[in-house]
Structures are given as structure tokens and as C-alpha cells.
Amino acid sequence: MTDNNHEHKQPLPSLAIAAIGVVFGDIGTSPLYSLKEAFSPSHGIPLTDQSILGVISLLFWAIVIVVGVKYVLFVMRADNNGEGGVLALMALALRSLDEKSKMAGLLMMLGIFGACMFYGDAVITPAISVISAVEGLEIAAPHLSHLVLPLTIVILILLFWIQRHGTAMVGRLFGPIMVLWFVVLAALGLWHILQSPSVIRALNPCYAYTFMAAHVLQAYVVLGSVVLVLTGAEALYADMGHFGAKPIRMAWYVLVMPSLVLNYFGQGALLMHDPKAIENPFFLLAPDWALLPLVVLSTIATVIASQAVISGAYSLTSQAIQLGYVPRMKILHTSELAIGQIYVPVVNWMLLFIILCIVIAFKSSDNLAAAYGIAVTATMVITTILACVVMVKVWNWNKLLVALIIGVFMTVDLGFFGANLLKVEEGGWLPLGIGALLFFLLMTWYKGRMIVKERTAADGIPLMPFLQGLLAHPPHRVSGTAIYLTGSDSLVPVSLLHNLKHNKVLHERTIFLTFVTRDIPYVNDADRVTVKDIDGGLYLVKAAYGFNETPDVKAVLLEVGRTHDMTFELMDTSFFLARETVVPTQLPGMSVWRERVFAWMHQNAAKPTDFFSIPANRVVELGTKIEI
């Protein structure tokens, strides 16, 4: 069986460097565009010293409160057996509730919507990150500015094309490269802070308050740009399972946060000295001789940031499939050593297509910035709500204390979310639309699967009495092994009924195999497989997997063989599957048009042979019709 190598056995500094290469790519490349967008001409904020100090103060305290306090100190405590992310947090919160209660239903919908918002963010991050880095050419080599869009498209196509080959080899370089990136951020910022040290006054939150009070409406609009410094904050929590909380906290406090703060303050110092630098305050931090190297390093950093988002989309899809919210898809493992490195072709090519359309339509990072942020803030609000449930129901914290903590976080989150709602018309509709469409599809799939399960249970035959009757009056037994994959270990598989009806035989060794997904990321190997010997060569096998794992039929059979002294020859084994055809009807459940959508999704789901890695030439599929 597969070892659960998700445990973190490397030295803390090594894990921290690795985390810097994966976890902090998105938030680490935010200085490329955040401050520039905050002073967008459309906001009408004058480039005075007081305004610059006010905006820098807002950026600083947003980073401290949302990332440094909310995520690093509180949310990262709410791990699901070491795993983070909105679906893992949802599973943890649901564990303490009655699954049939309205509260559980609401939390499930919130968690799924949060996951859908991640996809809305995942199509913006690579687009805005790469294009903002390549836009450095407009400063470093103005005569090449016409190449910004074509270069961005080429880089993105190459990035998605290499996914199928895995990124294990180049992944080892991500950490050191991003460490260099953060050191460069810090050095550029510190250089300008030393030239204009008065910018340090922005550490005082009074400047943020004064700015908000003086400009009110414009300042609230600016909050929609300030949130750009927080994009990627959710990754600290979502990637916790890969590295552990300690390395991520260490990387944040020792290198990432100081570097970001120094760079933002350095950009502020530059603007106070030369307001015209608002054209591109990040690249104008660098001396002329360093511009082209900085463009190259920025492009590499944004590719790494995009890679983290793409890998996150694969992982989230895999989790959602195991939890039953997404149809089966073909999942390929790109590394024999790291079980978490996977590739989902459908997700990969859909992301690339949408991202290229976005780049061609929006054309610049300035235009894309309007679309960025709303998905991030929506996920932040959902994370806060789910964390509140965990604090009260799982940790049993004092409700007054929870109200105080969550009240502060929710005020900040809703403030940012409200400010981003103002950008819906300019581009915020894009991630919202993607998220809403995915939410509809995921809820349709989940509801449809529940209806199919109910119809199957209503028409099903209890398994144990049936098998006892079968053993009492056995049909003709044939040599070999038959394995029936079934979704319920208490009902007779439809494929068995059809086999007995048409072929009138039963194999010498017959195994009923059921896969179940637990609400934890990983299942210990010792608890993976349970086998019940019914007698007469009949066995009930239940294989348990976590939502971060991919079921493996061959591995299960090896475990059964090891514990029950059996051998399995694949060429002497037949796998019997029921191919369900879903037929929309007027029966109670969903509206007919949603049932048709579900039937289409069901028809296009990956075949069980692909998903469970079963040799196609050993499979017997028997059709069955289910009316919903």
C-alpha cells in the first residue's frame, strides 16, 4: 500500500525554503501591481505625501491583520488532520454537526462556493501575474513594448504544456529562486526607504484612518485595490498539508512579510520623492542597469506563482471528486515519490483556454486588476464563517471570545468584499460568473448523485440475505475471480444481477469491492482495507481513502492478498461494473432541465476503468437505467 508520506520529516529550514517556493508565490508577486492600482487615475486620489502615507499604512495594516493575525495565528490552527483549504475546513466543521441539519447544508454550500471562487481566482492569477512582469519591458526596453502580449501568451502556453510532464525537477529550484526574489524585494525597498525615511511614518495606523476620513468614498474604492496585497493569503492555509504550519509561519515572519513591507514602503518613498513614478513604481525602484534582469526575475517569479495556483486547482479538483461534488475525471500522478503531485488534463486545458481569452480581452494588468480581488475576498469571508463554526463547535471556545475575534475579522473581510463589489462592472463579473457557473454545476452534480443513491436504495435488494440464498441454491460456478465494484456494501450490485440473469454463473472467488471517502485527508494504511469472509468464496471488501488520496484497485487487491493469503492474477480476474444511464423524468427531485444537465455530466464523467486504474481488457460493463 502507499505510504502516507505527507508527514513532514525534513528539517524546518528546508521545509520553510520549499514553502517559500510554493506557498508565497502569489502574495509575493503582488508588489508588481498593487500600489500602482491603488493610485489608478479612476480613483481620483491625489499623489500627495499624506495620501501616499495613508495608502501605505492601509497596505501595511491589511497585511498584519488579515495575513499575520487571522491566517497565521488563528485559521492555520483549524487543520483537518494537518490539511488546510476551504474544503478541508468545511469537512472539519461538518464533522461536529448533524449531516441532515439545515446548518450542515448551509455550511456545505458555503464551502463549495468558496472552492468555486478559488477557480474564479485561478484564471486571473496567472494572467495578471505574468502580464504585469512582462510589462516591465515597457520601462526597460520601450521599443519592445509591442511584444508584451505575445510574450505573455507564449509563456502561459509553455507553462500549461509542461504540466503533463510534472514539475518535480524544476520544482526544486522554486524555493531558492523565490528566496532570491524576496531578498531583491527587500533590497530595492530598503534602498529607497533610506533615501526618504519619512515614509516610515506610515507604520502609524492614524495615517490610514486620516486618509479614510479625508476621502471617504474614494478611499473605500481604494480598498478594492488594497486587497490586491492579500491575494495568495488563502494559500498559506490551503498548502498547509504539504509543508506543515511551522515552516509556513517561519517563512512568513522571517522573510516574506519583512520583504513585502520593505518593498511597499520603498515604493511609497519613491512616489513621495517622484510622483511621476506611479507609471510603474515597482520597476522604477531599480536602477537602469538592473531593469532587464529584474524583468527576467519577475517573469520567473510570476511563473512560479502561477504554477502554485495551477497545482492548487488540480488538488482542489481531486478533493472535490473524492468528496462527491465533482464528476470523476482522469487524474495522472506525475511523481512516484510525491503522492500529491498530480495532473488533471481536463482542468489544465480548460484553465489555459480561459486564461488566454482573458489575456487577449483585457490586454493589460491595469485592466485585469479590476477583475482581481472579488473572488479572493469572497473566499476570505467564507473561511472566517467556517473557522467560527470550528471555534465554537469543535474547539468549544468561549462564545463571547469567538464573537470578539470573528467580529474583527468579519468587519475587515466584509469591508474588502464590499469594496470589490464596486468593481463588478469593470471586470469583477468575470470571476463571479465563473464561480457562480461552477457552483451551479457542482450543486447539480451533488444533488443528482443523492437522487440516484435514493432511487438505487429504494429499488435495491439487501445483499446479505441474497448471498445466503445464493449459497443455499448456487448457480454454476466457474473458475477465476470476479470483482464487483459497488457504491453500497449493503445492496446487491446491479452488475451481479445482470450477470446471473444472462450468464447464470458465479465465479469461484467473488469479491464485492466498495470505496468510501472519509472526511480526513489521509487514511492510515492499517485502517485502509477491511475484508469480510462470507463463506463459499464470497468476500466483502471495503477500501477507505481520504479526500486527498486517489483510489487504487491494484493496491487494494495487494493488501487483500497479503492479509488473507490470496493471489490475484489480473489476466484471470474480471471486473464487473454497472454502466448507469440516467433518464430525466417528472419524478420529484430536481427540475427537468437540471436533471438534463446532470445526465450530461454523468455521461461525460471519466470511466471507472480510467479513474480506478483498472485494465480495460478485464472489464465487463453491464448497463442499467435509472430514472430521476
Swiss-Prot record:
The keyword Transferase does not apply. One of its GO terms (molecular function) is potassium ion transmembrane transporter activity. It comes from the Bacteria. InterPro entries: K+_transporter, K_trans_C, K_trans_N, Kup. The chain crosses the membrane at residues 15-35, 55-75, 104-124, 142-162, 173-193, 210-230, 252-272, 281-301, 342-362, 372-392, 400-420, 426-446. It is a multi-pass membrane protein. Its main location: membrane. Keywords: Cell inner membrane, Cell membrane, Ion transport, Membrane, Potassium, Potassium transport, Symport, Transmembrane, Transmembrane helix, Transport. It catalyses: K(+)(in) + H(+)(in) = K(+)(out) + H(+)(out). GO terms for cellular component: plasma membrane. It is found in: Cell inner membrane. Transport of potassium into the cell. Likely operates as a K(+):H(+) symporter. Belongs to the HAK/KUP transporter (TC 2.A.72) family. This is Probable potassium transport system protein Kup. It comes from Paraburkholderia xenovorans (strain LB400).
